[in-house]
């Protein structure tokens, strides 16, 4: 009698997955394209913030706003609108038309990219739905992300409007953090759905590994929220030393909680805002490192490789954050720190989704080599 050894469940030679349906490859490529576009949105949005360009367009015109000023008269009208803003009167008085155009193009480009993302989402979505290429779970997930994307556009305008109020020279930090976190949540949702459409089945990781893997994207999203508060309040410019904060490892309570009511300290007290972002970064790194050790012991192979990848990225992101702080947030470092946070979130989300496992199809239908970001972690993911 000849014995055969079953292939490991986390290898590419596993049985086809239940998600291996017609059009799977096209749907997956589309989801990853959307993820790339969202990262580009975050990058352009970060540059718009860091260059102080976010308040240069004072109206929200979802359709007609796609057309920029086309002649000198159009530019004069837009410039006059900007000169009525508090930001111009308080910070940018005397800026010339050429300087205004630089600000305008950043904000216009950010909004244009948002419209492009909407088109790239809804047109293929309608086609895939009509062709029957979207399973029920995937369809519901995409509908949810579509609604969240529409809400994100509204959040973006509410954020801009907050910066146009009397006495304001920038958008409200709380609204900026919400805008950034919502974009990050959309990105995580796209990557989660894409990773679940792999062609081949995958056995779930042990339950303890799954639990911590699922926790990591949540922690990263919280840290992105805290980073949004730092960015919106410019708290990163307050203490530019590390590991101390101008000689203090932990600032005294009277510095951290001097606002009334108490809850306002978590948004308006710049010392506490920066301290929270630092402290939570340490927590994320410690959890990622501990999880990598856990995965190596309990799930050697692909899951362990992914966990070590998450740990390495979180360490690199913390190092980049420290450099950004010490250099007093130059544009390149602040932008790199924001975009690299998206890389950490993508890797953590892929790891969490694949740790859940991908069920096998009831009957094999032929397999294709998976594509997508999860393949970057190495064979067997």
Swiss-Prot record:
| Substrates-to-products reaction catalysed | Fe(II)-heme o + 2 A + H2O = Fe(II)-heme a + 2 AH2
Q: Where in the cell is it found?
A: Cell membrane
Q: Which InterPro entries match?
A: COX15/CtaA_fam, HemeA_Synthase_type2
GO terms of biological process kind: heme A biosynthetic process
Residues recorded as binding heme, renumbered to this chain, are 277, 337
Q: How does it sit in the membrane?
A: Multi-pass membrane protein
Pathway as given in its UniProt record:
Porphyrin-containing compound metabolism; heme A biosynthesis; heme A from heme O: step 1/1
Domain of life according to the entry: Bacteria
GO cellular component terms, semicolon-separated: plasma membrane
Q: What transmembrane ranges does the database entry give?
A: 25-45, 112-132, 138-158, 176-196, 212-232, 279-299, 307-327, 329-349
Name the enzyme's class: oxidoreductase
Q: Which Pfam families match?
A: COX15-CtaA
Q: Which GO terms describe its molecular function?
A: metal ion binding; oxidoreductase activity, acting on NAD(P)H, heme protein as acceptor
Instruction: State the UniProt keywords alphabetically.
Output: Cell membrane, Heme biosynthesis, Iron, Membrane, Metal-binding, Oxidoreductase, Transmembrane, Transmembrane helix
Cofactor names from the entry are: heme b
Q: What is its EC number?
A: 1.17.99.9
- Self-association state and partner proteins as the record states: Interacts with CtaB.
* Family per record: Belongs to the COX15/CtaA family. Type 2 subfamily.
The record's function comment reads:
Catalyzes the conversion of heme O to heme A by two successive hydroxylations of the methyl group at C8. The first hydroxylation forms heme I, the second hydroxylation results in an unstable dihydroxymethyl group, which spontaneously dehydrates, resulting in the formyl group of heme A.
Q: What is this protein called?
A: Heme A synthase
Gene for this chain? ctaA
């Amino acid at each position: 009698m000849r014995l055969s050894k079953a292939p490991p469940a986390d290898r590419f030679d596993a049985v086809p997955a239940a998600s291996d349906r017609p059009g799977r490859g096209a749907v997956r490529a589309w989801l990853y394209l959307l993820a790339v576009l969202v990262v580009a949105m975050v990058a352009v949005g970060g540059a718009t913030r860091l260059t102080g360009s976010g308040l240069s367009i004072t109206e929200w015109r979802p359709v007609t706003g796609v057309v920029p000023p086309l002649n000198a008269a159009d530019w004069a009208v837009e410039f006059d609108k900007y000169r009525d803003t508090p930001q111009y009167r308080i910070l940018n008085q005397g800026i010339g038309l050429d300087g205004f155009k630089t600000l305008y193009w950043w904000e216009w480009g950010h909004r244009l990219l948002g419209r492009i993302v909407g088109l790239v989402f809804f047109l293929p979505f309608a086609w895939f739905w009509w062709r029957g290429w979207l399973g029920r779970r995937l369809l519901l997930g995409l509908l949810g992300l579509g609604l969240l994307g529409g809400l994100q556009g509204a959040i973006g305008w509410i954020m801009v409007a907050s910066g146009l109020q009397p006495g304001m020279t920038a958008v409200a930090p709380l609204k900026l953090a919400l805008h950034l976190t919502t974009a990050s949540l959309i990105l995580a949702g796209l990557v989660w759905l894409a990773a679940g459409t792999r062609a081949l089945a995958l056995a779930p990781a042990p339950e303890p590994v799954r639990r911590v893997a699922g926790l990591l994207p949540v922690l990263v999203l919280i840290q992105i929220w805290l980073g949004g508060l730092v960015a919106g309040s410019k708290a990163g410019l307050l203490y530019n030393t590390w590991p101390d904060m101008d000689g203090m490892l932990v600032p005294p309570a009277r510095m951290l909680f001097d606002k009334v009511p108490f809850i306002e300290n978590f948004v308006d007290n710049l010392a506490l805002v920066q301290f929270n972002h630092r402290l939570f970064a340490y927590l994320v790194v410690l959890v990622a490192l501990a999880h990598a050790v856990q995965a190596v012991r309990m799930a050697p192979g692909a899951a362990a490789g992914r966990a070590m990848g998450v740990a390495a990225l979180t360490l690199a992101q913390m190092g980049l954050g420290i450099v950004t702080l010490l250099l007093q947030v130059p544009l390149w470092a602040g932008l790199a720190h924001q975009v690299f946070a998206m890389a950490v979130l993508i890797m953590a989300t892929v790891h969490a989704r694949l740790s859940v496992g991908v069920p096998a199809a009831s009957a094999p239908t032929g397999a294709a080599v998976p594509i997508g970001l999860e393949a970057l972690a190495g064979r067997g993911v």
